[in-house]
Amino acid sequence: MQPPVPGPLGLLDPAEGLSRRKKTSLWFVGSLLLVSVLIVTVGLAATTRTENVTVGGYYPGIILGFGSFLGIIGINLVENRRQMLVAAIVFISFGVVAAFCCAIVDGVFAAQHIEPRPLTTGRCQFYSSGVGYLYDVYQTEVTCHSLDGKCQLKVRSNTCYCCDLYACGSAEPSPAYYEFIGVSGCQDVLHLYRLLWASAVLNVLGLFLGIITAAVLGAFKDMVPLSQLAYGPAVPPQTLYNPAQQILAYAGFRLTPEPVPTCSSYPLPLQPCSRFPVAPSSALASSEDLQPPSPSSSGSGLPGQAPPCYAPTYFPPGEKPPPYAP
């Protein structure tokens, strides 16, 4: 019988194939780690660009980066490799879900809430109260002109505002942001717009790369090198309980044929006899000495166990049978 495989998905791969799989896994994990660093960098740059626009696109980068770090450690481990790679796959899976959500949120926010056309055409103004004033304390009113007339807009210090996006005299707020607080110029708003789209693209890239990396690590964690293959306990030898085979296993042992049971010379009403026809006792004794053992008993090594047959005894006329003896 063949020895059992040590695991449900244990793969016997030569050392060269295992090394190639290891390099492939390291390449994918390293690429995912690099993308995670870019996601965190771009996300932090976007969320610190303004005060009133919060970006959460860097959270998937943290989760994916931690999962990639665990994956690099698990690939280079010899013992506890499977446990470490399973933990890496779990973190990468959570990072993939977070990247999917943040890619949608950042993309929708950049497309719906930031209008780049007034910024690129120079129709937005930047207001600064000067050195020594805090932008969250000092406020001023500026005049915005629209088709319906002019209106007053309160802005804080270090704010980029766009009167084209502000609905004068309208109770409904504008869907697009018309002011960006805490910037050093209106060019920072354009940078924020580009960073949001870059964060969305990087999150999509991290989404697909995370799925592929999790699949590669899942295939690598079940691989077992030939040098570390440990077979299970050996199967005990199967014992044969056939008496004939156990007896014939001893060298030089020969079976002696047992004598064939014969009928007694004393006549009885019913007496056991062999398969031979009824004969006198003297003739039966001489035939027993000359007859060789039967092939069935000598060939198989088992004693002849033919069922005894009982035949009635015939007496010549005028002779009485012997008295019955139990």
Curated annotation (Swiss-Prot):
<dbReference type="InterPro" id="IPR028014">
    <property type="entry name" value="TMEM255"/>
</dbReference>
<feature type="transmembrane region" description="Helical">
    <location>
        <begin position="200"/>
        <end position="220"/>
    </location>
</feature>
<keyword id="KW-0472">Membrane</keyword>
<comment type="similarity">
    <text>Belongs to the TMEM255 family.</text>
</comment>
<dbReference type="Pfam" id="PF14967">
    <property type="entry name" value="FAM70"/>
</dbReference>
<keyword id="KW-0812">Transmembrane</keyword>
<feature type="region of interest" description="Disordered">
    <location>
        <begin position="284"/>
        <end position="326"/>
    </location>
</feature>
<keyword id="KW-1133">Transmembrane helix</keyword>
<feature type="compositionally biased region" description="Pro residues">
    <location>
        <begin position="305"/>
        <end position="326"/>
    </location>
</feature>
<dbReference type="GO" id="GO:0016020">
    <property type="term" value="C:membrane"/>
</dbReference>
<feature type="transmembrane region" description="Helical">
    <location>
        <begin position="26"/>
        <end position="46"/>
    </location>
</feature>
<feature type="transmembrane region" description="Helical">
    <location>
        <begin position="55"/>
        <end position="75"/>
    </location>
</feature>
<feature type="transmembrane region" description="Helical">
    <location>
        <begin position="85"/>
        <end position="105"/>
    </location>
</feature>
<protein>
    <recommendedName>
        <fullName>Transmembrane protein 255B</fullName>
    </recommendedName>
</protein>
